[in-house]
């Protein structure tokens, strides 16, 4: 029997559909005290979640390119898009399906530390020979022993060695404890690396040799024996070693100190995740030049894509996505794992470490004399009457005297110090680093080899730096915090590609250009092509921002297909919709999400002012300004498929929104060619002049806010621009925004001594000349601070002389409070709207008549913190960036672009 289909519909039947009207009214009247509606539910209801409805059904087809062009700089794919009758194409859900191969280059290292002998001491050698002068020194540990009487030559000859025997993992039996081997009656057995081995000899930590067979042997030549004698007996053999000829390798490490082959120290290469950029930024080429993408009908061949160099296609997509959904979820779609950083690295909350009972290390056996094996003897039988003692037969005694020997280390302090060294010190500006002696680094400062080999000065950051404070290192405030191995978004995107240098990729890339990504395309035949960059610095992102082109990364596209979604409709429905959309009154209208014209104004190194002049123009429909600061080295020429001067692969704030220099602005003035003040006289400060932050330790009028040096005036301006909260700015915003102001505003303060002749600034003296080592702290328990912090400790225990105490009974009385703030991921905003405080007489545009109906020139002047490298002022002018799309005939499409007040244009086919 066929089931009654009416009981199996998707949504479930409503009681109103089949109950009598009187019963429905009764249920509604009594439901507040007795809900009887549940009594009338259908016994069979299909699920309403996890099912496919007619609203979600689409037909997705693959379109293969008709023409491709593959050269050194880009890959171009041209598609013929046929939209048949009874079909509508949703270009908003279309995407490019790309297959290819990726060589992430030798600088790719997706982990910290090393994979090879990570438990070995930093300077410990492997069993190997090394040359000192004219002598060959053999350094080896021989853990296996055998009986060897007299000269031991016969026994040594009898020892059987092979490619894998003796195994370097074998040694003394379990539970044997520390044993002093008598080399006159016993001999040792082990393995040693041959002097003839190829490659650079390396410490045991991070040393590697490739296996030759499945047995694990590493020798590339037949095994020979090496004999040694460490006794005073002439002609004796006290050790036998199997000699391996190997190919020395150190895949993930480098030298940090080198004297000779037997005296060197290694460190693991720095982590360097490499993956596609967030939302595949940079892979698709957006520009108004000859290499722009195109969408045209086959009848007239006129491109309807009008992109401009001052449009923000990539950044608009970032902002749109952030407002549509959470940037911290759904990472698998479109590769949109957002760039982030560890706030505890950017802003160090140095609350010290947690103390407890001492951390002690004990001998494995537990019973031992201090730094020597337990004493060996026998049990004794004591005659109390005669007061004599004699050895008890068949007994052995192993005795340690005194307390169990132990060594102590402050494990929490060491863990804290390791965190600060690996996460902060290693990312210091290059000015605060040095090249270890006898270490050769590449001349190119942008290469991974150079960045990897430089070491930080020890005293810049330590466990006592700004202790007790929440403060960012001043020298780190202008360092890109997103270029860090704790960027979880980049790490995720790198891991999506796997953990190997060479990988295959299969990715889906969305269209971001605002006129195409929303378009509903009517029946016809169209040409659609786009350019895909191959420059690894633009397409890929790395942790350290090294020059991936220089370091050998390569991208190869093997296949680019287009997937488009067709709405399956019946003939009548499709025909009706098509007729409506063909009508000019039903044009499709789209806005660029960010709606801004961007301009870059160069700020030379050391300069603290930048002036912007805009000639006469009408300012109708103008919405205001957004601005921040970018480094020249981190900003590519987006008008080129490959910028040869762009030698950097970290985040690109210009495209991805990872702004981090907004805190470097001091003030901004805005002047029109008119005496009418703007934006009015009811602001805290002088009209037309915005003070963003006060100089350090200066706030005579009390304008600062939230324990920082940000002014109340500019705080209110940002609250008005971001959340429509002007003088009500001291209230919680109604929403959170990934790129919002208060979400990213980080105030901080600290106390510091007032330095004078009595209280000298030892840190300044150290930075002036590290060789003087003026700071005494942890003396004897670490390497001296004029050299490499990774070497063994030296010196002796002594009193500390730094930092000055700021708390407790001995607190320095003469202290001053320093305040500052950071506001990353954010563009400063100054709105130009009647809603912003007072704009005078309003028009229907909501703006002052003077600016809406006549032309005026504009002068803006910014005062910024000077930096030691050239930067840009990124200034966004808020415009209405619109496109109107009309498809009057089959295969006919016309597009009109409107950008007020800055530009307009049109394209039609």
UniProtKB/Swiss-Prot annotation:
Q: Where is this site: Involved in interaction with pre-protein VI?
A: 726
Q: What does this protein do?
A: Major capsid protein that self-associates to form 240 hexon trimers, each in the shape of a hexagon, building most of the pseudo T=25 capsid. Assembled into trimeric units with the help of the chaperone shutoff protein. Transported by pre-protein VI to the nucleus where it associates with other structural proteins to form an empty capsid. Might be involved, through its interaction with host dyneins, in the intracellular microtubule-dependent transport of incoming viral capsid to the nucleus.
Q: Which GO terms describe its cellular component?
A: host cell; host cell nucleus; T=25 icosahedral viral capsid
Family statement: Belongs to the adenoviridae hexon protein family.
Which Gene Ontology BP annotations are present? Answer: microtubule-dependent intracellular transport of viral material towards nucleus; symbiont entry into host cell
Q: Using the record for this protein, list the coiled-coil segments as residue ranges, or answer none.
A: none
Is Hydrolase there in the keyword field?
no
Using the record's annotations, give every residue carrying the modification Phosphotyrosine.
897
Pfam families the record matches:
Adeno_hexon (PF01065), Adeno_hexon_C (PF03678)
Expression is induced as follows: Expressed in the late phase of the viral replicative cycle.
- Its name, as the record gives it, is Hexon protein
**Matching HAMAP family:** ADV_CAPSH (MF_04051)
